[in-house]
From Swiss-Prot:
Residues 328-341 have a biased composition (Polar residues). It catalyses: [protein]-peptidylproline (omega=180) = [protein]-peptidylproline (omega=0). It comes from Arabidopsis thaliana. PANTHER family: FKBP-TYPE PEPTIDYL-PROLYL CIS-TRANS ISOMERASE FKPA (PTHR43811), PEPTIDYL-PROLYL CIS-TRANS ISOMERASE FKBP43 (PTHR43811:SF48). This is Peptidyl-prolyl cis-trans isomerase FKBP43. Belongs to the FKBP-type PPIase family. It is an enzyme of class 5 (isomerase).
């Protein structure tokens, strides 16, 4: 690799030419960086390859994107022209690569003994077109050839011994090792045989040819047994080399049968008769717990419905005796299991008390309670300041909020909590306590005029009592049947939010 860099200035182009002496050179373009300058406009880098239309590579903007990482390689027979569109130059950096080399599919795979393959002229092709005549050593050659050693038994030849033998072969120049990646062929012809991929999870067979005495190693399988077609092809291969098919078939079939028996044993579930006594006790206890939970839930439902049974329809009332019988039977079972009737009765009573105490109150009752508490507090609190306006509205300041908060002025949106009562009778006719605050624009027509006048000038957290005359209340229309037209109104108001 050789470093490469250039500055492409605006209005000028840079042409990348191939070197005629060394042939085509591969340029790896790594980064584009904005040059020095005071211009704030963006600069665009583009390139032309031969007569093709220009392509934009990156856009650089000062103070935002000053550099851009690129990962581009140029190996073109035509000229590559770089140019800049914009006020500032662009610096390009990268490096030259060597000549392009072909892809080697077996580069990532390592030889079984850490040695490279030499003197092997292999061509890509299908398993049917390839001639395997040169793939095996003749029987006359006393050299020992081995594939991957997958056996870990003590009787197997160790890796160290195999490496020593291969070194001796190289010194003498007699042995030559060859490795190929075979695939299992679908045809059952005698000319081609199945080849298994070389990996740690696949079955491997080691054949040692010493004269005419074949030795077949054990088959080691980590995940699954060999398919029948592979066994046939391998057995056929061994017959061609050694002439003893019986031994090969017996060894392969014995291994496959052992795998099948082991798989069948693992797949069979355990019967109930073979369970240990501890497991049986656990199952009985879990069933008892389920029965208890069911009986408790059904008892609670019936006890809560006892008070409302009178108002229920006849169809639902007729269903109660059936459920009672079912509960009695389940409770009898529980009594027979526990042996103590008094404890179960106490538990039922306790559950009934908890059910009665945990019944949630109605929202209307809660609201009434809140209103009563507010009325008591408002009645006990004395006004800090009282003033009467010229239009008859009486304003009593009960509590001061934030002194530095926003003041309610006409045109602003105000959110308030309020309670409205009649001055003469004290009856509550309107309230939003416990609900969302009332939101309106001050000076608008969404609320009565007296309420809008009384809220003006309040800050967040302020509380006021407003006494509004009928003329500024509901004198024109009234409020349904709750407020007569001639009624004086008393509002307790709290400012929650001012915008």
């Amino acid at each position: 690799m050789a470093f490469w860099g250039v500055e492409v200035k605006p209005g000028k182009t840079f042409t990348l030419k191939n070197n005629e002496a060394t042939g085509i050179r591969r340029l790896h373009l790594s980064q584009a960086t904005l040059g020095h300058g005071t211009a704030t406009n963006r600069s665009i880098l583009q390139c032309n390859v031969g007569n093709k239309s220009p392509l934009l590579l990156c856009v650089l903007t000062p103070d935002k994107v000053d550099s851009c990482q690129l990962n581009l390689e140029f190996e073109e027979t035509d000229e590559v022209i770089f140019s800049v569109i914009g006020p500032r130059s662009v610096h390009l950096t990268g490096y030259f690569l060597g000549r392009s080399t072909g892809f080697r599919p077996n580069d990532d795979e390592s030889e079984s003994f850490g040695e490279d393959i030499v003197d092997t002229d292999m061509e890509k092709g299908s398993s049917d077109d390839y001639d395997y005549s040169d793939s095996f050593i003749n029987d006359d050659d006393p050299a020992v050839r081995g594939s991957h050693v997958s056996s870990t038994d003590d009787d197997e030849i160790s890796i160290k011994e195999m490496t020593a033998k291969t070194k001796e072969k190289k010194k003498n120049g007699k042995g030559r090792r060859l490795r190929k990646k075979f695939q299992v062929s679908d045809s059952d012809s005698d000319e081609t045989s199945a080849r298994a991929d070389e990996s740690s999870n696949e079955d491997s067979v080691e054949v040692l040819n010493n004269g005419n005495e074949p030795k077949i190693a054990k088959v080691h399988s980590s995940e699954s047994p060999l398919p029948s077609r592979v066994t046939r092809s391998k057995a056929r291969k061994s017959t061609l080399e050694s002439g003893e098919p019986a031994k090969c078939e017996k060894t392969f079939e014995a291994k496959i049968n052992t795998h099948k028996t082991l798989d069948n044993r693992e797949d069979k579930p355990l019967d109930d008769a073979k369970l240990s006594p501890v497991q049986k006790d656990c199952e009985i206890l879990s069933k008892k717990k389920r029965n208890k939970e069911r009986s408790k839930s059904s008892a609670i439902i019936i006890d809560s419905d006892d008070g409302e049974g009178k108002n229920m329809p006849e169809s639902l009332q007729n269903e109660n005796p059936v459920s009672d019988k079912g509960i009695k039977s389940s409770s009898d079972v529980l009594l027979s299991q526990n042996g103590d009737a008094t404890l179960s009765k106490k538990k039922k009573k306790r559950d009934r008390r908890e059910e009665t105490t945990d019944v949630p109150e109605c929202p209307e009752k809660k609201k009434q309670a809140i209103d009563k508490n507010i009325e008591k507090e408002a009645g006990t609190k004395k006004p800090l300041e009282t003033r009467t306006l010229s239009n008859g509205v009486i304003i009593e300041d009960i509590e001061k909020g934030k002194l530095d908060g926003k003041s309610a002025v006409k045109g602003k949106k105000v959110s308030i909590l309020y309670t409205g009562k009649l001055k003469d009778t004290g009856n509550l006719f309107d309230s939003n306590l416990g609900e969302d605050p009332l939101r309106f624009r001050l000076g608008g027509e969404n609320v009565i005029e007296g309420l809008s006048i009384g809220v003006e000038g309040m800050r967040v957290g302020d509380k006021r009592r407003l006494i509004i005359p009928p003329a500024l209340g509901y004198s024109k229309r009234g409020l349904k049947e709750k407020v007569p037209k001639s009624a004086w109104l008393v509002y307790e108001v709290e400012a929650v939010k001012i915008r």
